[in-house]
Amino acid sequence: AQISDTHIRADDDRLSARQLERALAEAHEYRADVILLTGDLVNEERADEYEVLARTIADVSRPLYLMPGNHDDRARIREAFPRHGYLQHLGFLSFAIEDFPVRLVAIDQIVPGETHGLITQAGAEWLDRTLAAVPEKPTIVALHHPPFRTHDMLFDDIGLLDAELFASVIARHRQVERVICGHHHRVAVGQVAHAPVIIAPSTSWVYGLAMYPGQKIAPKTAEQPGWMLHVRAETGGF
């Protein structure tokens, strides 16, 4: 189960927390093997927002993992989730989870103080080494910013820099069956090298689309928030 862009706030009468609780309950009902939150965990990087998030996920019985988005602060994530050992290292919050039939590799490409993402040379080398270490196991790669242009100018302008570098790494590793991300607040699909890319919706709100210059967009629409369930068939493939 992929839950993204939860934008937890401490001052919204628990609306954002309740929306996350609803998504978590549905993921549990569908017996998700694992739950991954793909960034923008909170809205303003505040410690009290991470406290609300920690309380909201405290009783989740399924394995649950967190990764940062451009609204997040790495140090505060570490402080709020000390029992999440995969987060307790210096530098980027990138990690690989080996405990399931599908390997999960999450790459942190956040630039502090900026809304865009960036694949650094060091990040690309880490991803390349991590994927090369287990070449035969089906793998999902997760990041926050979409690694392709969606043609929604609102988000393409604050998208992933050096997406070509990311694509060049993915192209070398055929076991990557899917790339998943968030940031866009709505479902969209694309492709990087051989791998389909799926953008999950947000549990918080949905922005209007900006498809041409000068277009007036709704900052928030009446569309329902959501989350994404990725299902792999027993015969292989998603």
PLM regions: where:
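N-terminal active-site segment of His-dependent metallophosphoesterases
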Residues: 1-52, 56, 150
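Active-site glycine-centered loops adjacent to acidic/histidine catalytic or metal-binding residues
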Residues: 5, 39-40, 69, 144, ...
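A short acidic, helix-capping loop that chelates divalent metal ions and anchors anionic groups
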Residues: 8-12, 75, 113-116, 149-153
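Short gly/ser/thr-rich secondary-structure transition/capping motifs
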Residues: 18, 86-90, 160
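His/acidic metal-ligating clusters that form di-metal
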Residues: 24-34, 116-198, 227-229, 238
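Short catalytic/ligand-binding loop motif for oxyanion handling, primarily in non-cytosolic enzymes
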Residues: 45, 74-76, 148-151, 187-190, ...
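Extended active-site neighborhood of metal-dependent phosphoesterases/phosphodiesterases
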Residues: 47-133, 138, 165-175, 193, ...
